[in-house]
Curated annotation (Swiss-Prot):
SUPFAM superfamilies: 4Fe-4S ferredoxins (SSF54862). This is Ferredoxin-like protein. The keyword rRNA-binding does not apply. Coiled coil: none annotated. InterPro entries: 4Fe4S_Fe-S-bd, ETF-QO/FixX_C, Fd_FixX.
Length: 94
């Protein structure tokens, strides 16, 4: 039986340079939050908590699951849209 990491390794991601499909509107807003839930809940690990309290986002490898969209919807600090056609996650099952 395969581990989830092995299955995720088979997926590919086509980066749309200069056009990320997720954007943190105000990075300073995240420093005010005591819990940075996106850094824990994102299955792809796209969010990182920095030592200064800020949250950085790298969308390369995003699974487009929408978890961050749900977690951050109350704050309204996240801009999330589907990637353009031909870009984003390319699932490979096998």
């Amino acid at each position: 039986m395969s581990k989830i990491e092995e299955k995720l390794f088979q997926d590919r991601y086509r980066v749309d340079s200069g056009r990320p499909h997720i954007r943190i509107k105000d990075p300073d807003h995240c420093t005010e939050l005591s819990e940075k839930q996106c850094t824990v809940c994102c299955p792809a690990g796209c969010y990182t908590r920095e030592t200064n309290g800020k949250v950085t986002l790298v969308t390369d490898g995003c699974l487009e699951c929408g978890t961050c969209r749900i977690i951050c919807q109350d704050s309204g600090n996240l801009e999330w849209e589907w990637p353009r056609g031909g870009f984003g996650i390319l699932f490979k099952f096998g």
